[in-house]
Amino acid sequence: MANACTFEGFPSDRKVLKVLTLGHSLTVDSCHFLALIAAAEGDPGLKIATLYYSGCPLSRHVEYLQTDSDRYSLYESNSAEPTPPRITPGMTMKKAVEQEDWDVILMHGGTFEPAYETTYGTGHIQTIQDYVNQHKTNPNAVFGWHMHWVFPTDPELMALYPYTPNGYQVGYEKFGGGRKELYEAIARCMEKYILTDSTFRCLIPTGTAMENALAAGLTEKDIHRDYAHATDYGRVMAGYVWYCVLRGIDHLDDIKLDRIPVKYFRSNKGDQDILLTQEDKKLLLEAVNNALKKPLQVTQSQYTVK
């Protein structure tokens, strides 16, 4: 085991590592800067693709693979030529799986789904894995799981949900707890169902890194841009967690990414590069390293955000 998140048999030592994720917007957020991060770390061999459908739960993945639906979009980037992800609409899961000889296929649930034990007894995970195994072109490809982050409870962020009723307020009401309780429920399910499933060879604890950042004194508005999604700072944090797990890094010595070029922003993100300060890097490094060391536990920070 290279670290607490990368298990025996994970192909982290490949010079070129090809990764396909089956996800939604939180996956897109996590991978948005991943190629840029890998390039900054001197690693030109990471290729990442996300098969995206908005908020996609496991049940919808099953529906779409059974009907060969082309309602997905495929987001692709690679660290040899780090640019914002290229988006191809009208993609099916079959086409995405067969497109490359992927080394790793990553999965995760939709919105609140990973917090419920009933999620892991539906058979959806097995159905998706069977389908991928049927169509993958690399017989040695392995599966991993993305432990995505908990959603903000800040009223101003929650109010940015564009529909009525508010799906995230309803989700929290149905769950019956707050942010802390939701994180703990997800962590319990990871320990009980994912870490004990030998078909998964890695766990990417993005959600734990986010909670570690909050423990350092950051606010939800520092890491979330709305009711669910990450700020650019949150995206960098998520990207570093992904990079370390995918490359089997158990401890990151420093953050080599210095700036995020303006071409990576959406239109409402301004017109200048984002520079990462030493304070930014210090907090990022701690949150990421603590998540790698203790992926299912929030670690209190030695820093205090002013």
Regions found by a protein language model. Give the residues of each.
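N-terminal module-boundary/linker segments of secreted carbohydrate-active enzymes
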Residues: 2-43, 284, 295, 300-305
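Cysteine-dependent hydrolase recognition
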Residues: 1, 174-177, 290, 306
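Residue-level signal for beta-strand positions within conserved beta-sheet cores that form or flank
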Residues: 15, 44-46, 139, 199
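Short hydrophobic segments within beta-strands
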Residues: 20-22, 51, 146
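Conserved catalytic region of serine esterases and O-acyltransferases that act on ester linkages
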Residues: 222-306
